[in-house]
Amino acid sequence: MRTPITCLLAVLPLAANAAKPWQTVNDGETFKVDCEGTYQHHLQGVCTDETSIYWSFTTTLVKTDTTGKVLKKIPVANHHGDLCIHDGKLFVAVNLGKFNDPKGNADSWVYVYDADSLQQLARHETQEVFHGAGGIGVRDGRFFVVGGLPGGVEENYVYEYDDEFKFLKKHVIKSGHTLLGIQTATFAHDRWWFGCYGNPRILLVTDADFEMTGRYEIDCSLGIEGMTGGRLLVGSGRCEKDEGCNGTAMIAFPDPKTGFRFQNAAVQ
């Protein structure tokens, strides 16, 4: 979503894990990936097939290996938000209109890309996402789109689509208000994870039916993705004037007290 973003990156002792493949990182270890390069706009989301990492930088879609080396990148329409991967394809929440407009003057879409080549394959209208599509997750072959929220609204909304993007249902999360709605989404480890802006930034966790199970003051508003082995991949980044914006991804583990945790890191 269009809002100034400044995120602090954790300073990590990486030497012990620098040469270790991230697929084998276990609880108690640290793994961090810096996306190569800088970009005009800030990070919106990350996803992975555990072979490559995909990064949405608002107007640039980037594919890297698991060390952060760029393999492919393409310019994309403003505003590409959060993304997910399914069946060899990337699905990106896109808004071409106004975010967070109480009158619903958004223009919500999901754009589909080939995960190998980043070639665009399809565009699906998701105009039911009334305040602007900003995030997307997938579960059992169905897609769940989240997005903006005007001030004063004390709940969030999730819009469910089938595999051909036929609208199925609008779900309500009794979350209380979150600034500009929900930015990132993933279904992992039998629950939904939703990253939100704010001061402090907020993580919402629900069960599979969108009933709240936790609200945490921890930041995954720039990306969260489920991984095998009970792990999560969490995105972060920052923008520097005259230098551009960068992105980082770190492996985390669910934690019932804090939402999730990074090992050996002071997370801010």
What name fits each language-model region?
Residues 28-37, 68-74, 119-126, 167-175, ...:
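A short beta-strand motif characteristic of beta-propeller blades
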Residues 32-59, 79-81:
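Beta-strand-rich domains and repeat architectures in extracellular enzymes and scaffolds
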Residues 40-45, 78-85, 128-138, 178-184, ...:
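Repeated scaffold domains used in trafficking and secretory/extracellular systems
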Residues 50-51, 87-88, 140-142, 189-190, ...:
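Short coil/turn segments that connect the beta-strands within blades of beta-propeller domains
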Residues 55-56, 100-108, 149-155, 197-199, ...:
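Short, solvent-exposed loop/turn segments at conserved positions within beta-propeller repeat blades
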Residues 65-69, 114-118, 162-166, 206-209:
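Short loop/turn segments that connect beta-strands within beta-propeller blades
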Residues 69-100, 108:
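Blade-loop segments of beta-propeller domains
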Residues 105-115, 156-163, 248-261:
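Beta-propeller blade signature
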